[in-house]
């Protein structure tokens, strides 16, 4: 583990509905081995020695969250989520700035329960020595095709410098807050935290992480996540 003993705060935007799962509830509340996806994710973050607290942004009136084991955990704080991911993250950042001042925050997808502590440790090590921060990422392995308007292949994209963006993504609290607030105010499309920093002209680090750190998006992803988690437990 990293020798850096400072504590950081993690923010988990969990206000999404996950319509592609075609389930009766948002994907973060689907079960894997008796626990919700969100519980697995938050517990994984809390297990890292350098993460002091986890701020979870959920929809106001969410009927599922109060029933979770993490809802009463002393190191888990609930804040109101927003319409878009960036709104939820900004809500978490505003809480952190007001109540839990810290230099760095890690933002992690609610639907990525398979992140490893070693990957988080490596991310923290790299980011704390980087002027901007960075993200976990995985190099693209497959041949990539760009489609034309008819959904036929237009050309093959050089994958040499292409990476899949994963999470957590770790940035300085004040800089990320400013980037997201300014981008939202100007109507800039922000798909992840790194894109907000890129919009400011920054160049975040790419920290190679495990491709097993999947985001649960489709129904078949649940079984794959369960496999990875069970293998991790041994």
Swiss-Prot record:
<comment type="pathway">
    <text>Isoprenoid biosynthesis; isopentenyl diphosphate biosynthesis via DXP pathway; isopentenyl diphosphate from 1-deoxy-D-xylulose 5-phosphate: step 2/6.</text>
</comment>
<dbReference type="InterPro" id="IPR050088">
    <property type="entry name" value="IspD/TarI_cytidylyltransf_bact"/>
</dbReference>
<dbReference type="Pfam" id="PF01128">
    <property type="entry name" value="IspD"/>
</dbReference>
<comment type="function">
    <text>Catalyzes the formation of 4-diphosphocytidyl-2-C-methyl-D-erythritol from CTP and 2-C-methyl-D-erythritol 4-phosphate (MEP).</text>
</comment>
<keyword id="KW-0808">Transferase</keyword>
<keyword id="KW-0548">Nucleotidyltransferase</keyword>
<dbReference type="InterPro" id="IPR001228">
    <property type="entry name" value="IspD"/>
</dbReference>
<feature type="site" description="Positions MEP for the nucleophilic attack">
    <location>
        <position position="159"/>
    </location>
</feature>
<dbReference type="GO" id="GO:0019288">
    <property type="term" value="P:isopentenyl diphosphate biosynthetic process, methylerythritol 4-phosphate pathway"/>
</dbReference>
<dbReference type="InterPro" id="IPR034683">
    <property type="entry name" value="IspD/TarI"/>
</dbReference>
<protein>
    <recommendedName>
        <fullName>2-C-methyl-D-erythritol 4-phosphate cytidylyltransferase</fullName>
        <ecNumber>2.7.7.60</ecNumber>
    </recommendedName>
</protein>
<comment type="similarity">
    <text>Belongs to the IspD/TarI cytidylyltransferase family. IspD subfamily.</text>
</comment>
<dbReference type="GO" id="GO:0050518">
    <property type="term" value="F:2-C-methyl-D-erythritol 4-phosphate cytidylyltransferase activity"/>
</dbReference>
<feature type="site" description="Positions MEP for the nucleophilic attack">
    <location>
        <position position="215"/>
    </location>
</feature>
<dbReference type="InterPro" id="IPR029044">
    <property type="entry name" value="Nucleotide-diphossugar_trans"/>
</dbReference>
<keyword id="KW-0414">Isoprene biosynthesis</keyword>
<dbReference type="InterPro" id="IPR018294">
    <property type="entry name" value="ISPD_synthase_CS"/>
</dbReference>
<feature type="site" description="Transition state stabilizer">
    <location>
        <position position="27"/>
    </location>
</feature>
<feature type="site" description="Transition state stabilizer">
    <location>
        <position position="20"/>
    </location>
</feature>
């Amino acid at each position: 583990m990293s020798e850096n003993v400072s504590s950081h705060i993690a923010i988990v935007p969990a206000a999404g509905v996950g319509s592609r799962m075609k389930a009766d509830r948002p994907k973060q509340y689907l079960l894997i081995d008796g626990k919700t996806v969100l519980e697995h994710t938050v517990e994984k973050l809390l297990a890292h020695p350098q993460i002091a607290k986890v701020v979870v942004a959920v929809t106001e009136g969410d009927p599922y969250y109060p029933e979770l084991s993490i809802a009463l955990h002393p190191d888990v704080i609930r804040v109101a989520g927003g319409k878009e991911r960036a709104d939820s993250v900004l809500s978490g950042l505003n809480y952190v700035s007001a109540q839990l001042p810290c230099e760095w925050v890690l933002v992690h997808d609610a639907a990525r329960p398979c992140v490893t502590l070693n990957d988080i440790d490596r991310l923290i090590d790299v980011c704390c020595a980087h002027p901007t921060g960075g993200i976990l990422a995985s190099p693209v392995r497959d041949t990539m095709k760009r489609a034309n308007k008819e959904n036929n292949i237009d050309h093959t994209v050089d994958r040499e410098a292409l990476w899949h963006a994963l999470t957590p993504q770790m940035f300085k609290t004040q800089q990320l807050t400013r980037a997201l607030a300014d981008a939202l105010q100007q109507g800039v499309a922000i798909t992840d935290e790194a894109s907000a920093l890129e919009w400011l002209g920054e160049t975040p680090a790419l920290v190679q992480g495990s491709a097993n750190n999947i985001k649960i998006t489709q129904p078949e992803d649940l079984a794959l996540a369960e496999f990875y988690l069970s293998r991790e437990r041994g």
